[in-house]
């Protein structure tokens, strides 16, 4: 989802430039699901080895949170010692109210995500900071 790189960039720039707020589109209530790319790769390998044929299987975390909740978490991870407030631009759209996959079939086949969002966000941020140097 595009909101992750955008959120990381906004928080990083606010931290770097000593800004006291970030601006997010909408009201922050839209819900999203995140899955780290390594988890998707592991799921692909898992299901290739299972030899599941002719079956569509949703791969995701199965857990959603609001954009506001993600923003607070990302702020805590990226700028833990800074006071950066979240402001909402209500003139911009909220987006789809909720995006979360039903992963019950994947679970039925024995797969479940290893979902540690804090670690995944930290890895993503570390990768981002290496790339922008």
What are these regions (language model features)?
Residues 6-7, 11-133:
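C-terminal substrate-binding subdomain of Rossmann-fold SDR/epimerase-dehydratase oxidoreductases
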Residues 3:
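The catalytic Tyr-X3-Lys active-site helix of short-chain dehydrogenase/reductase
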């Amino acid at each position: 989802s595009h909101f992750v790189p955008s959120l990381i960039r906004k928080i990083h720039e606010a931290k770097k430039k000593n800004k006291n707020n970030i601006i997010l589109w909408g009201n922050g209530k839209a819900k999203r699901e995140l899955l780290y790319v390594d988890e998707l790769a592991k799921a692909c390998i898992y299901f290739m080895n299972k030899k599941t044929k002719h079956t569509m299987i949703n791969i995701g975390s199965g857990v959603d949170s609001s954009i506001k909740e993600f923003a607070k978490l990302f702020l805590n991870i990226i700028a833990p010692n800074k006071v950066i407030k979240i402001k909402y631009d209500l003139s911009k759209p909220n987006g789809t109210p909720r995006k979360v996959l039903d992963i019950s079939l994947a679970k039925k086949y024995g797969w479940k995500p290893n979902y540690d969002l804090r670690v995944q966000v930290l890895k993503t941020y570390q990768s981002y900071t290496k790339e922008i140097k």
